Amino acid sequence: MLMPRRVKHRKQHHPTRRGAAKGGTRLAFGDFGIQAVEAHYVTNRQIESARIAMTRHIKRGGKVWINIYPDRPLTKKPAETRMGSGKGSPEWWIANVKPGRVMFELSGVDETVAREAMRRAMHKLPMKCRFISREAGEF
């Protein structure tokens, strides 16, 4: 699982999900990618399950890059606790993904295999995404 080894502060404010991504909107490494269409939080488990779905489909060919990192803790209070008595304990690590952000990249396979691998990974993610490729000029 992706998570920071150590952090300065255990708990943070919730990140805002408004606005478009400022950087990371173009393909940097691979020939194909998954681009976010809407804003959402992506947990470290969702990132890992999307990575596994892609790598199992492409088998030994190709290389996968993960361009997002879950660096923010999201807290949760235990079930059936009364209000107050402080903030809950950190439960998940999340990456705040905004529209336009390229989350995963892939190269070394043909487009039909890449499209199917990315489709399987998109089903694991909590927001609408789109497939982009360098050849189509969508980078």
UniProtKB/Swiss-Prot annotation:
GO cellular component, as recorded: cytosolic large ribosomal subunit
Function: Binds 23S rRNA and is also seen to make contacts with the A and possibly P site tRNAs.
UniProt-listed GO biological process terms: translation
Similarity-based family: Belongs to the universal ribosomal protein uL16 family.
NCBIfam families: rplP_bact
Gene Ontology MF terms in the entry: rRNA binding; structural constituent of ribosome; tRNA binding
SUPFAM superfamilies listed in its UniProt record: Ribosomal protein L16p/L10e
Comp. bias (Basic residues): 1-20
Protein name, entry field: Large ribosomal subunit protein uL16
Domain of life assignment: Bacteria
Keyword terms of this UniProt record: Ribonucleoprotein, Ribosomal protein, RNA-binding, rRNA-binding, tRNA-binding
Region (Disordered): 1-24
Record text on subunit structure and interactions: Part of the 50S ribosomal subunit.
Pfam families reported in the protein's UniProt record: Ribosomal_L16
Protein species of origin: Nocardioides sp. (strain ATCC BAA-499 / JS614)
